[in-house]
């Protein structure tokens, strides 16, 4: 019985310690190196919470943009020299008194991304017009998933882009 308890305690200890994500596992980090319209385009970084979790951690970058403007924002990765990305776009709308997401193209949400030198993302915001927005428009969203290697590990960082026809104060 004692051997069984020791074995169970050892197994439980190994499982708990191996499931802890350490903070030193660095995500992809970015610095805003250019912003042609800082009054209407802002970027914020909210690091993941420090502590133990059973879920994978992802860093969180949020970009807010007013829909009626255009401009460019450049984000340069500070801890990886070779990044790739994918882009997914959608609209938030009200339909039948319920909020819904509908898929959209880059052109429809007015967001396009280019990887300029393998470590810099140039995000272009096109000016949107009311007549081009879907009925019940609440906002446009783009998710940029950025992939790279940090410390020999494959990592992903999400950059969420929100566009609204309500002007947000830049912080």
What do these predicted ranges mean?
Residues 15-40:
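Bacterial Sec-dependent N-terminal signal peptides
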Residues 8-9, 19-23, 102, 121:
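A ubiquitous, low-specificity "background" feature that marks scattered single residues
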Residues 34-171:
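First exposed extracellular module after export/assembly in secreted or surface-exposed proteins
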Residues 1-18:
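Sec-dependent bacterial lipoprotein signal peptides
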């Amino acid at each position: 019985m004692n051997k069984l308890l020791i074995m169970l305690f050892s197994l439980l200890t190994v499982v708990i310690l191996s499931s802890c994500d350490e903070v030193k596992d660095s995500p992809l980090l970015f610095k805003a190196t250019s912003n042609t319209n800082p009054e209407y385009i802002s970027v914020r970084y909210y690091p993941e919470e420090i502590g133990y979790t059973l879920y994978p951690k992802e860093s969180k970058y949020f970009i807010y943009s007013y829909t009626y403007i255009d401009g460019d924002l450049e984000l340069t990765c500070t801890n990886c020299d070779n990044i790739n990305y994918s882009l997914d776009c959608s609209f938030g709308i009200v339909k039948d008194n319920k909020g819904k997401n509908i898929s959209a193209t880059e052109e429809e949400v007015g967001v396009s991304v280019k990887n300029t030198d393998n470590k810099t993302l140039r995000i272009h915001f096109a000016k949107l017009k009311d007549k081009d927005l879907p009925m019940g428009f609440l906002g446009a969203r783009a998710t940029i998933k950025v992939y790279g290697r940090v410390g020999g590990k494959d990592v992903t960082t999400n950059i969420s882009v929100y566009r609204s026809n309500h002007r947000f104060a830049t912080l």
